[in-house]
Amino acid sequence: MKSAVLAALSALNSCPMQPNITVRLQRELFDAAAEAAQLTRGRSDVGALVQFTGICRGAEEGEPIAALTLEHYPGMAEAEIERHVGEALARWPLMGVTVIHRYGRLSPGEPIVLVIAASSHRAAAFAAAEFLMDYLKTRAPFWKQVETANAANWVDAKATDDAAAERWRERDDAAE
């Protein structure tokens, strides 16, 4: 379901057809190929599709991971992700965006997040997908707990993730 803000931003996007937008939080596994097919179905204007799938690693700092638990603030998380999808639509000429983020207890090797950006050209698709992942890693209202054989610890955002997200703000400042 598309929020009113996202619908308004979609209308301002420079693409002639309305962008296909999917934002979903779920416990279940997702099918990345099926999601990509759904995003581009009926669109002959898509020339580039960039897809990122984040996967639960089997080790953190050399220690084996038993599980990863992701929690979120229902309603707020979807609204915040939609807001950033809207920002991506305002920045780049996108034909569509899919963001699916899982929550609950995940095992190593399972997919966590899917971001797909569709555009007529690769530069916009790559930039939008990277922008959205940088946001999801640093600002989305998710909490991550890593469970090892010895402990379960809540994880903070990494400085490298914060630096990656900061470059988008620096680009905005330079453009003004």
Mark where each language-model region is:
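N-terminal, polar/charged subdomain of small-to-medium soluble alpha/beta proteins
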Residues: 15-112, 126-130, 134-176
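Short glycine-rich or small-residue beta-strand-to-loop segments that form or flank ligand, phosphate
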Residues: 112-119
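Intrinsic disorder/low-complexity segments
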Residues: 1-16
